[in-house]
């Protein structure tokens, strides 16, 4: 997943349509920030009358009046600060929400090979960290630019009005600072991209340990995982230091340049021609205080570049992800009243990460209501066949047809609606049992239909023992259930769909012997109405299949019924002999 090298302007132009619906909030916030800056500058400008009139002439009445003015200005400053903070938080929250929704939706439609090549930790970082970084960095930069920019302009106006002779020197440092900021812009963006990548790696490493903590404990892998995490976190630290160094160098340079301006003001104040211009103690205090006050916004404006570049770098990463092509769905066939005639014709397929084909010139047919079992050693290509039927992957050569129509001509939603899959890797959601069985279609099925599917999968045996029955929340990925119970819910989910094609990818592998026997009885009833592909490790579960295909290195080595294959005295009999004797 490569990031496009776009300029900051191009990136912001693309981000603007997401922000623009909330521009009223930005305008209100901008006005409030300007008022806030004017209030700050106003407080400094009050120093001249306070010193010259109030204290210099000991005017008690004037001092009393100024006390009310100071309270009013500070009150105005507080109100404007609240309004600007609230409006910007509202806009930022909206932008983060939209970005996260777009990324989440886009990821749901990405093809399976994309997830093979990108870790879930890295993708989670895109949804959480990068989306937040775009909004926070952009809003933070806006606050700095508008508020500090308005503050500097206000201070300049106060200085010029008070004593333009002392103030004129300040204009000399502006172009120098602008050149410096432009010089470091590109570097900040590059470093920020590296930080985002490191964050993705850090998240991925931590996620692997958390998901596989039982394996870590079982094999004593704590030291290995600690070293792996330490390496990734140290890499992130070093990249963070590079950003800190770039930031630390730019700030002192700006401040040194500004210090020369301050020194010049002090020196010019001693020049008689300037002192003759009615320069009072109040005037000098206002000019000098304004220049001191200007150091903070100048520093902030220097930092805003780094802050803004972080957001733009994150934005480029997210747009690069959004630009990736989603799953191809060019088919138009609706697939209504599918009978279930499935055919593989000279199918060859190779995974992107491998050189050797997973399937080679594979051909076989499955008639309606028939069961074909696929057996073979791990890595022979059995599960690949199941993935091709549902178009999780597309064939390189040949074709797969359903009812005589190429599956690529079907709409993806229609094809998958007609193919129910139960794999050895069961995934359940943190929801009720009923909603997991009727996943993505809970309004389509009645309570009675859900119960029937659960009974047919022999899941009601344990569901009825739970305190809340079908309404029991099972935790993330069914953490509160046993492996066999989770597998039965997955089978119930597939049965409820009542699809004409049923794919069982070692679906009974996690069941105990008694449960497996019950499931086999249920599946035998269903096989008369469905086209079934069974991928099995235990040969005892597929002895009654209409045809058994022995897959080896992506090719069909043997085919026939259970008895026919035993009579061949070949690979199937060897597998059978090994399992019987164990």
UniProtKB/Swiss-Prot annotation:
Lineage: Bacteria, Pseudomonadati, Pseudomonadota, Gammaproteobacteria, Pasteurellales
Compartment(s) where it occurs, according to its Swiss-Prot or TrEMBL record: Cell inner membrane
Protein name, per record: ATP-dependent lipid A-core flippase
Family to which this protein belongs: Belongs to the ABC transporter superfamily. Lipid exporter (TC 3.A.1.106) family.
Record key words, sorted: ATP-binding, Cell inner membrane, Cell membrane, Lipid transport, Membrane, Nucleotide-binding, Translocase, Transmembrane, Transmembrane helix, Transport
Keyword Nucleotide-binding carried by entry: yes
Membrane topology recorded in Swiss-Prot or TrEMBL: Multi-pass membrane protein
TM ranges: 15-35, 68-88, 140-160, 161-181, 254-274
Species this protein is from: Pasteurella multocida (strain Pm70)
Entry's free-text remark on domains: In MsbA the ATP-binding domain (NBD) and the transmembrane domain (TMD) are fused.
Main location: membrane
An example Gene Ontology CC term for this record: plasma membrane
Any single Pfam family the record assigns to this protein: ABC_membrane
Protein task: Involved in lipopolysaccharide (LPS) biosynthesis. Translocates lipid A-core from the inner to the outer leaflet of the inner membrane. Transmembrane domains (TMD) form a pore in the inner membrane and the ATP-binding domain (NBD) is responsible for energy generation.
Residues the record lists as binding ATP: 376-383
């Amino acid at each position: 997943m490569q990031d496009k090298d776009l300029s900051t302007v191009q990136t912001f132009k693309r981000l603007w349509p997401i922000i623009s619906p909330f521009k009223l909030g930005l305008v209100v916030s901008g006005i409030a920030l300007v008022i806030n800056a004017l209030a700050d500058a106003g407080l400094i400008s009050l120093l001249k009358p306070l010193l010259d009139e109030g204290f210099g002439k000991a005017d008690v009445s004037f001092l009393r009046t100024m006390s009310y003015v100071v309270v009013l200005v500070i009150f105005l400053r507080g109100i404007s600060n609240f309004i600007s903070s609230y409006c910007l938080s509202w806009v930022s929250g909206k932008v983060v929400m939209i970005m996260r929704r777009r990324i989440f939706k886009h990821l749901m439609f990405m093809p399976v090979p994309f997830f093979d090549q990108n870790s879930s930790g890295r993708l989670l970082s895109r949804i959480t960290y990068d989306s937040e970084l775009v909004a926070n960095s952009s809003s933070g930069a806006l606050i700095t630019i508008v508020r500090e920019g308005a503050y500097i302009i206000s201070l300049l106006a106060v200085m010029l009005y008070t004593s333009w002779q002392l103030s004129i020197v300040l204009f000399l440092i502006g172009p120098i600072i602008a050149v410096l900021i432009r010089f470091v812009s590109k570097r900040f963006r590059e470093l920020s991209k590296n930080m985002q990548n490191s964050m993705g790696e850090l998240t991925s490493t931590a996620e692997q340990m958390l998901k596989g903590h039982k394996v870590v404990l079982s094999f004593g892998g704590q030291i290995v995982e600690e070293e792996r995490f330490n390496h990734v976190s140290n890499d992130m630290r070093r990249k963070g230091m590079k950003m800190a160094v770039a930031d630390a160098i730019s700030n002192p340079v700006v401040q040194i340049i500004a210090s020369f301006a301050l020194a010049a003001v002090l020196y010019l104040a001693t020049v008689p021609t300037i002192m003759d211009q009615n320069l009072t103690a109040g005037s000098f205090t206002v000019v000098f205080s304004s220049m001191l006050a200007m150091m903070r916004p100048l520093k902030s404006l220097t930092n805003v570049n780094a802050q803004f570049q972080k957001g733009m770098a994150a934005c480029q990463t997210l747009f690069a992800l959004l630009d990736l092509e989603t799953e191809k769905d060019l088919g138009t066939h609706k697939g209504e009243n599918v009978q279930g005639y499935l055919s593989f014709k000279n199918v060859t397929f190779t995974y992107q990460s491998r050189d050797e084909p997973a399937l080679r010139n594979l051909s076989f047919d499955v008639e309606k209501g028939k069961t074909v079992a696929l057996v073979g050693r791990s890595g022979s290509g059995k599960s690949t066949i199941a993935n091709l039927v549902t178009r999780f992957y597309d064939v390189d050569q040949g074709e797969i047809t359903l009812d005589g129509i190429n599956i690529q001509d079907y709409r993806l939603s229609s094809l998958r609606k007609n193919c129910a899959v139960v794999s050895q890797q069961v995934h359940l959601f943190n929801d009720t049992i009923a909603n997991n069985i009727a996943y993505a279609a809970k309004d389509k099925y009645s309570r009675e239909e859900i119960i029937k599917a659960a009974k047919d999968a022999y899941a009601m045996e344990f569901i009825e023992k739970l305190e809340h029955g079908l309404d029991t929340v099972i935790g993330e990925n069914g953490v509160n259930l046993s492996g066999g119970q989770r597998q039965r819910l997955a089978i119930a989910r597939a049965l409820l769909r009542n699809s004409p094609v049923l794919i069982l990818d070692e679906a009974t592998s996690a069941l105990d012997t008694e449960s497996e026997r019950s499931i086999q009885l249920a599946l035998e009833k269903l096989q008369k109405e469905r086209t079934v592909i069974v991928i099995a490790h235990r040969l005892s579960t597929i002895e009654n299949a209409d045809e058994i295909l022995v897959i080896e290195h992506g090719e069909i080595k043997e085919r026939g019924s259970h008895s026919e294959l035993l009579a061949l005295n070949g690979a199937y009999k060897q597998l059978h002999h090994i399992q019987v004797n164990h």
